[in-house]
Amino acid sequence: KEEEETEKGGEKREEVENEIEADDYGERPSIQKLPEVEGKDESARIPDEYGKALVSEKFDCTPKEFFKACCSNSATNTFFLTQSKASGQTNFSCTEWAKHSHYGFSRDVKFVAPVNSTFGPKETRCVQTQTYKLYPDDNLIIGYSQVQLDIPYGDYFSVESKWNCVPLFTEGDRKMNGCEVTFHVHVLFEKYTYLQSVIQSSVLSETKESAEVFLNAAKDVLNNSSNSKSSAMSEEKSATFLERLSKRFSIDVT
């Protein structure tokens, strides 16, 4: 009976831990159930066709904290919507994260974006599928797949983007003390056009600029959150010290 109770207790603890993680990530399954990728190097999880990172930034937070602040369900109508408006996008809509058979989780984003081009429409409808997967080593991969419905040759290609969020550790005790986020893009052509090189160059330039703006905004949000936590902890310590002082010397500190 003791062994059975111990096993049941272990199962309950595991369920609770999964529920805590689910609060941060939506209905995320156990990490162990997600498909593994061969190779220990995190870069192996970014296919070769994506090439080198266009943008890279380090953060004083874990990959989970980065996700929660910028990409979680709770961040959709705050950080994510703010970034959409700042980019000039309208008619923004976003579903919640749902389980995906291969990528872990996915959601659909729709919006109307301005077009920076001398010819064609001034704006276009965009449909974007986002995915994410968290690996056992805390490496987080967030993927975007976007098509633009109203631009010339819009049905010829899709823009495939990946955010690679790799945890950083201190030397010696190997304690996680931050993460590095790199941004990779691949223009996937479904049909041939003689304008492929022009389209690819334009996409890389625009997505790099957007990624830089996104990461700078993410850093501001995370820094503000960190400062708020530090301030709250400092106030709590001061209050506790004053309470101890008051009790010891019978001093009224109110």
Question: Where do the model's predicted regions map?
Answer:
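Terminal single-pass membrane anchor helices
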Residues: 227-254
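Phosphoinositide-driven peripheral membrane association surfaces
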Residues: 1
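Beta-strand/loop substructures that line and gate deep hydrophobic ligand-binding cavities in soluble
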Residues: 136-202
